[in-house]
Design a protein with these regions (language model features):
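PEST-like low-complexity, intrinsically disordered acidic/proline/serine-rich tracts
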Residues: 4-169
């Protein structure tokens, strides 16, 4: 999937309200263990002993992605959406701020914006590509599709979150 130069808009085609407290639906979501499992030996290029030692020493790109993209294993997220940005508190985890447009964040080049009604965040670094798509299935159900390219392997993960109803509603 050639995602270079994603055509992302500064606003969705119609109002999309992502703000709120969202709790993961484990049953409906993909299994994280399958996502983080090393690729089967036959799919991974054969490495010499030295290369294998170096790979282990460097740590896997996927492990780095899981650490840096806490949406992958957050149990709950709190989203504060503005016109041109979004803040996401990951529980457990840290706070992440995303501004629409093109930005550099640490080692990442981040493109964020809208495709129709979906919020898309595309992050690239050396040998790593992460595509996140936030999609409201209905006003109280959020689907998150992740495509991760790391360690020469493509992985996909889909997670579902339900909006927490405010007390007394």
């Amino acid at each position: 999937a050639g995602c270079q130069g994603l055509d992302l808009a500064q606003a969705p085609v119609a109002a999309v309200q992502l703000s709120g407290v969202w709790t993961v639906d484990e049953e409906a979501s993909d299994d994280l263990r399958a996502f983080t499992r090393p690729p089967s030996e036959r799919r991974r290029p054969k490495l010499s002993v030295q290369e294998e030692i170096r790979r282990i020493g460097l740590g896997s790109g996927l492990a780095f992605v899981v650490q840096d993209f806490q949406i992958i294993d957050a149990q709950q997220i709190v989203i504060e959406q503005d016109r041109d940005s979004m803040g996401v508190k990951h529980i457990p985890g840290t706070y992440r701020d995303v501004t629409w447009g093109d930005r550099e964040r640490d080692i990442w080049r981040v493109q964020a914006g809208w495709q129709e009604m979906d919020l898309v965040i595309f992050s690239t670094a050396k040998g790593l590509r992460i595509l996140e798509r936030y999609q409201l299935v209905n006003p109280n159900r959020l689907r998150l599709d992740l495509e991760v390219q790391a360690d020469g392997v493509n992985r996909k993960l889909t997670r579902f979150f339900d909006r927490k109803r405010r007390a007394g509603r």
